[in-house]
Curated annotation (Swiss-Prot):
Protein's cellular compartments: Secreted
Source species taxonomy: Bacteria, Bacillati, Bacillota, Bacilli, Bacillales
UniProt entry keywords in alphabetical sequence: Glycosidase, Hydrolase, Secreted, Signal
Keyword presence, Cytoplasm: no
Known EC number: 3.2.1.132
Name of the protein in question: Chitosanase
Chief location bin: secreted
The protein's role, per its UniProt record: Aids in the defense against invading fungal pathogens by degrading their cell wall chitosan.
Family annotation (Pfam families): Glyco_hydro_46
Keyword check for Membrane: no
Residues at the catalytic site: 54 (proton donor), 70 (nucleophile)
EC class (word): hydrolase
GO biological process: carbohydrate metabolic process
Record family assignment: Belongs to the glycosyl hydrolase 46 family.
Amino acid sequence: MKISMQKADFWKKAAISLLVFTMFFTLMMSETVFAAGLNKDQKRRAEQLTSIFENGTTEIQYGYVERLDDGRGYTCGRAGFTTATGDALEVVEVYTKAVPNNKLKKYLPELRRLAKEESDDTSNLKGFASAWKSLANDKEFRAAQDKVNDHLYYQPAMKRSDNAGLKTALARAVMYDTVIQHGDGDDPDSFYALIKRTNKKAGGSPKDGIDEKKWLNKFLDVRYDDLMNPANHDTRDEWRESVARVDVLRSIAKENNYNLNGPIHVRSNEYGNFVIK
């Protein structure tokens, strides 16, 4: 009987230890996920905001293809991947690894040439647009776009946010939307260039002790100015028509919704009216 009581006591302590460990692990994981970016609902809302700006709908447009005459060839898919900048190429490469025999595989040599030359030429991409559109509901094609989007845009946006000391979900969503449109290159219109200009105007970043809300307001000013007067003249007309996306983001800040809670009401003459839950 004594042995049985000892065993019972052992298992009771083991159960308590396991419970404590589980609670600690869960807490650490939740904090890690938040530190790495946005939570699931915040990320969804950020992506839906960008989808409104890019495609006029809260539904992610995997099958979107259009030539915007902005110097970037075809603009495609959920993040506006383009044939001139190499991200459309990366999507097709990732997709081809998953599905070796696909409709887009034959365009890989030309996509590589266009990416290398940063060319907006689409003369040798006959049938590319229709092939891309036809794969809109393909599970692997969607997964390829999601993977490239996270690798090239979402993760870098969260890293830049961490480096700048940004804590609010809205600020991080603004960073994500900015990198989607401006890219994360080293040109004067790039995402990082805008951050550097903002830091100069604000006297530093939130990581340096600058108030995050004031810094974000400065950043939106800088981005607005860049959209109106981009260094890249090929994008000038297209970008000037997109300044309303900054107005929408600023309106969310004015509503003090820095946690990016739903519902978010988007009211825009340029993009229309939407409710993001």
